[in-house]
C-alpha cells in the first residue's frame, strides 16, 4: 500500500491527540467502524450436556474464504484447534484427523499432524466396493460432515444412506497419556440391513522438535525411528526404536492401539509402509434397521490401567469436566457464560506432566511450542497459571514449582527451555522473569491461604547439580536476585538488561543497545515491580521472613515514587538510557509515542494520580482503542512508515497488555473496562472478522490492528511467524479469564488478603468454580 493511500485510509490515527496530522474526514469517517452481527462464519456455538461446544459446518474445499496463508509455507484449507488434558495435547482439524503431542520429556509428537496428513480415523467398507469414513476426503458424496470441537473432545458426524457414523476423540482427565476413541454406528429404521467392516486406523508418524531446528533436520530425526510391533487379542503395541538417539528427544515410547469394545472384538494388523507402519483394528458388523453399535478404542502411550466399562468411563470423564471448569454469568456480556469455561478448559488442557523437572509445565504453546520447539518464556508459564488459582489451585501450584525448577541457585530464571528441557540463556536476557513467579506465589497464597505449600521441597534444574531447597527459599532468592542483581539503571529505575516484557523493546535503530543493556532502565519493570513486591511482602512476612518483607516494601515504595516522576505531562515514559555521544542527555523511550504496557501498571501500583489516570483513559479511548474492534494497540500513534505497522510490538493488540488495561481502568471507568473485555472475546473476533478461522475457538498472543494489511490475523517476522500456528496461544485463554476476575474486583492486596470489590455500578456478573466463587 502506498504511503499516501495509507494515510488517506487511516488519517484518523492520532488526530484526537494532535500527534500526527488529521486528514479531512466526513462525519461518517469519525464514527467507530460498524461490526457485523452475523452468525459465526464457520458454524455455531451451542451448549451440549452442560458444556460449550462448537459445530464446524462449512465445506472448506468449496469455500473461498477457507483458504488461509500461514506465511512460511503454502496456503491451505486446514483449520485446526488444540485440546488436551494434563499429559498431552490433541491437534484436531476440519479434515477429521488429529495429532497427539506431548512434553513429558521434551517437545515431541507421538502421532504427527501437519498441513497434509494427520492420524486416527474411521474407515467403513461396505459391499459393492463402497468406502467412506470420518476423514473429510472420505466423506460420502454431496455431504458436509459435522465436525464438533468440545472442551476436551473432537468428533466427526457423517452419514451414508441411513447409516450414521459418530466418531469422538476424548482426552481423559488427569495425567493420562492416551485418548479414548468412541465410534458409534446407527442404522436408521427405514434402511436396509447392512454388513460392513469398520477399520480403526492410526498411521505411526513420530516427530521431535529440537529448538530452532529446520524441517529438514526434523524429518531426518524422525527417520531414525523404527517400531517393534507386537499383536495380542485386544491390542497392538508399537515399541519405538531410536537408531540415532542423539537426534531424538527423551526415551523411546511404547505406544498402543487397544480394542476396548466389550462385545465386538476386532482383528489386529499393522500395515507396513515406506517409512512407518499403520496400526489397524478391523471389526465386522451386522446392523439391522434401528440398531446402534458402539466400538471403543484406546490410543497413546501404553498403560496398564483397566477400563472395564468404557461407556461408564466416558461419562465419568465428561462429568469431571463439567464439575472442574468454572461457570460465569453476565447480563451485559452473555457470551461470558460459554467463554469462561471454554477458556479454562483450553488453559488446563495446555498443561503437561513433566517427567524431567517434576510437576506440570504450561507452555505458551502456538508457534513457540509447536513451531520453534521451545517453552518460552518463563514469564508466560507463570502468567497463564494465575487464573487457574481460582479453579484448579493445585495445578497452578504445580506450574509454579515446575517453572521455579528452571532456574539456578542464585535465583535467576532462564528465558526459556529448549525442546529437550535445557535452560535457554543465550537468546534473551529479560529483566522481569522473577516478578511473575513472585506474583503467582502471592496470588496463590492470597486465594488459598495455603502457606504449607511454600515449605515443600523445591529442586533446581538438573544442569546445576544443586541441592534442593524449599519453595519459600527459592522465591526468596528470586526476590533478592531481582532487587540486587537485576538492580537499578538510568534514573534509578529497574534495569532493562536486553529486554523486559517486550522482547523487541531495544530494536529501535535510535537506541544504543550495549549502553541500554549495561545501564538502561525500564519504567514498566519499576511499575510492575512496585505492585508485585508489595503483594509478595505479606507472603514473606507470613512465612517468618520479616527482613525480606521489609526490603520488598521499601523497594516497592521507591519504585512507585520513581514511576510517578516519569510522568511526562501526557503519559508515563517507557524507559531511559544513559548518555551517549549521539545523545548526551540520555535516551528517553516513549516520550514521542504512548507505549501502552507501562500505563496500566503505573495506575495499579499507585504512581498515577486520579487526574493522570483519568487523562490516560481519555488517551486510550481516542488513541489506542480508536476504530479497533479487538481492543487497544500496544503503541500510539503507530509508525505509518513501517511496513509491519499494526503488527506485533509495532502497534498490535496484545492479550497480556489489554488484561492489565482492563484491570487498571475497571477502577476508573468500569464501562470502558467492560467494553475492552468484550473486545478481547472470541465473540467479538467472530463479529469483526467472521471469515478468519483463528479467533473462532482460540487465538495467538497478539492480533494485527486495523491499519495492518492483514487486520484480524496475527504477526509475522522474517525470523518466524505467529501466523504459521495462530491458535492455542495460552494468552488467548488465560487473559480473558483473569481480566474477568479483575472486572469483578478480585485481586490480592498489600495485606496478603484477597479483595472482592467491583467498581461496576450495575450487576456485572459472576464467577463460580469448585474452589472459589464471587458475584456482583
For each feature predicted by the language model, list its residue ranges.
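N-terminal export signals
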Residues: 5-25
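C-terminal capping/lid segments that line or modulate ligand- or cofactor-binding pockets
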Residues: 32-61, 74-99, 343, 373-376, ...
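An extended acidic
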Residues: 38-43, 47, 84, 89-159, ...
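Extended, loop-rich substrate-binding clefts of extracytoplasmic carbohydrate-active enzymes
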Residues: 130-178, 263-281, 765
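Polysaccharide-binding surfaces and accessory modules of carbohydrate-active proteins
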Residues: 170-272, 281, 313-320
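Beta-strand-rich recognition/accessory modules
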Residues: 178, 254-317, 516-519, 532
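Extended glycan-interaction surfaces of carbohydrate-active proteins
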Residues: 329-373, 400-418, 479-519, 561-655, ...
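Aromatic-rich carbohydrate-recognition surfaces in CAZymes
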Residues: 374-494, 523-526, 530, 651-665, ...
Amino acid at each position: 500500500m502506498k504511503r499516501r493511500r495509507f494515510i488517506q485510509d487511516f488519517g484518523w490515527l492520532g488526530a484526537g491527540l494532535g500527534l500526527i496530522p488529521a486528514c479531512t474526514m466526513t462525519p461518517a469517517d469519525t464514527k467507530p467502524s460498524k461490526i457485523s452481527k452475523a452468525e459465526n462464519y464457520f458454524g455455531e456455538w451451542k451448549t451440549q450436556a452442560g458444556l460449550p461446544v462448537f459445530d464446524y459446518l462449512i465445506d472448506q474445499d468449496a469455500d473461498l474464504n477457507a483458504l488461509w496463508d500461514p506465511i512460511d509455507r503454502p496456503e491451505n484449507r486446514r483449520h485446526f484447534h488444540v485440546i488436551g488434558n494434563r499429559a498431552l495435547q490433541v491437534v484436531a482439524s476440519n479434515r477429521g484427523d488429529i495429532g497427539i503431542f506431548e512434553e513429558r520429556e521434551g517437545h515431541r509428537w507421538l502421532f504427527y499432524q501437519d498441513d497434509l496428513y494427520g492420524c486416527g480415523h474411521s474407515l467403513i467398507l461396505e459391499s459393492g466396493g463402497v468406502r467412506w469414513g470420518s476423514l473429510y476426503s472420505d466423506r460420502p458424496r454431496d455431504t458436509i460432515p459435522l465436525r464438533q470441537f468440545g472442551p476436551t473432545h473432537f468428533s466427526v458426524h457423517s452419514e451414508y444412506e441411513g447409516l450414521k457414523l459418530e466418531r469422538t476423540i476424548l482426552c481423559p482427565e488427569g495425567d493420562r497419556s492416551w485418548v479414548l476413541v468412541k465410534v458409534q454406528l446407527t442404522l436408521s429404521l427405514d434402511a436396509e440391513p447392512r454388513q460392513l467392516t469398520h477399520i480403526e486406523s492410526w498411521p505411526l508418524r513420530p516427530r521431535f522438535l529440537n529448538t530452532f531446528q529446520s524441517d529438514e533436520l526434523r524429518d531426518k530425526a524422525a527417520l531414525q525411528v523404527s517400531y517393534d510391533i507386537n499383536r495380542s487379542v485386544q491390542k497392538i503395541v508399537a515399541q519405538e526404536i531410536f537408531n540415532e538417539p542423539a537426534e531424538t528427544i527423551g526415551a523411546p515410547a511404547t505406544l498402543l492401539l487397544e480394542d476396548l469394545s466389550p462385545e465386538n472384538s476386532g482383528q489386529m494388523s499393522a500395515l507396513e509402509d515406506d517409512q512407518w507402519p499403520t496400526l489397524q483394528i478391523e471389526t465386522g458388523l451386522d446392523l439391522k434397521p434401528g440398531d446402534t453399535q458402539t466400538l471403543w478404542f484406546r490410543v497413546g502411550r501404553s498403560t496398564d490401567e483397566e477400563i472395564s466399562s468404557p461407556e461408564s468411563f466416558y461419562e465419568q470423564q465428561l462429568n469431571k469436566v463439567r464439575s472442574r471448569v468454572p461457570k460465569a454469568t453476565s447480563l451485559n456480556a452473555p457470551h461470558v457464560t460459554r467463554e469462561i469455561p471454554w477458556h479454562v478448559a483450553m488453559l488446563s488442557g495446555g498443561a503437561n506432566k513433566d517427567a524431567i523437572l517434576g510437576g506440570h509445565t504450561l507452555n505458551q504453546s502456538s508457534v513457540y511450542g509447536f513451531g520453534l520447539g521451545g517453552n518460552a518464556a518463563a514469564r508466560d508459564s507463570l502468567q497463564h497459571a494465575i487464573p487457574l488459582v481460582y479453579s484448579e489451585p493445585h495445578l497452578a501450584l504445580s506450574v509454579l514449582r515446575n517453572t521455579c525448577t528452571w532456574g539456578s541457585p542464585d535465583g535467576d530464571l532462564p528465558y526459556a527451555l529448549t525442546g529437550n528441557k535445557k535452560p535457554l540463556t543465550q537468546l534473551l536476557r529479560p529483566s522481569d522473569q522473577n516478578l511473575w513467579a513472585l506474583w503467582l506465589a502471592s496470588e496463590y497464597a492470597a486465594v488459598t491461604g495455603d502457606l504449607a505449600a511454600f515449605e515443600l521441597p523445591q529442586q533446581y534444574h538438573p544442569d546445576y547439580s544443586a541441592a534442593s531447597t524449599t519453595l519459600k527459599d527459592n522465591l526468596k532468592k528470586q526476590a533478592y536476585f531481582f532487587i540486587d542483581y537485576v538492580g537499578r539503571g538510568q534514573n534509578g529505575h529497574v534495569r532493562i538488561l536486553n529486554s523486559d516484557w517486550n522482547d523487541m523493546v531495544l530494536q529501535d535503530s535510535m537506541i544504543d543497545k550495549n549502553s541500554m543493556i549495561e545501564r538502561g532502565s525500564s519504567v514498566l519493570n519499576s511499575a510492575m515491580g512496585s505492585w508485585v513486591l508489595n503483594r509478595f511482602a505479606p507472603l514473606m512476612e507470613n512465612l517468618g521472613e520479616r527482613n525480606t518483607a521489609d526490603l520488598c516494601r521499601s523497594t516497592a515504595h521507591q519504585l512507585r515514587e520513581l514511576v510517578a516522576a516519569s510522568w511526562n505531562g501526557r503519559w508515563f515514559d517507557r524507559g531511559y538510557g544513559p548518555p551517549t555521544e549521539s545523545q548526551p542527555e540520555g535516551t528517553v523511550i516513549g516520550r514521542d509515542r504512548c507505549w501502552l504496557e507501562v500505563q496500566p501498571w503505573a495506575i495499579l501500583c499507585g504512581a498515577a494520580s486520579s487526574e493522570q489516570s483519568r487523562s490516560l483513559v481519555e488517551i486510550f479511548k481516542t488513541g489506542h482503542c480508536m476504530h479497533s474492534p479487538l481492543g487497544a494497540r500496544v503503541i500510539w500513534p503507530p509508525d505509518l512508515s513501517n511496513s509491519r505497522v499494526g503488527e506485533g510490538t509495532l502497534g498490535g493488540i496484545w492479550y497480556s497488555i489489554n488484561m492489565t488495561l482492563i484491570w487498571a481502568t475497571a477502577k476508573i471507568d468500569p464501562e470502558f473496562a467492560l467494553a475492552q473485555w468484550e473486545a478481547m472475546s472470541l465473540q467479538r473476533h467472530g463479529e469483526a472478522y467472521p471469515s478468519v478461522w483463528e479467533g473462532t475457538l482460540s487465538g495467538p498472543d497478539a492480533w494485527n490492528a486495523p491499519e495492518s494489511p492483514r487486520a484480524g490475523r496475527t504477526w509475522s517476522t522474517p525470523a518466524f511467524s505467529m501466523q504459521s500456528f495462530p491458535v492455542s496461544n495460552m494468552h488467548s485463554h488465560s487473559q480473558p479469564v483473569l481480566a474477568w476476575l479483575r472486572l469483578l474486583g478480585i485481586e490480592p492486596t498489600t495485606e496478603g488478603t484477597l479483595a472482592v470489590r467491583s467498581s461496576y455500578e450495575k450487576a456485572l456478573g459472576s464467577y463460580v468454580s469448585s474452589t472459589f466463587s464471587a458475584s456482583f
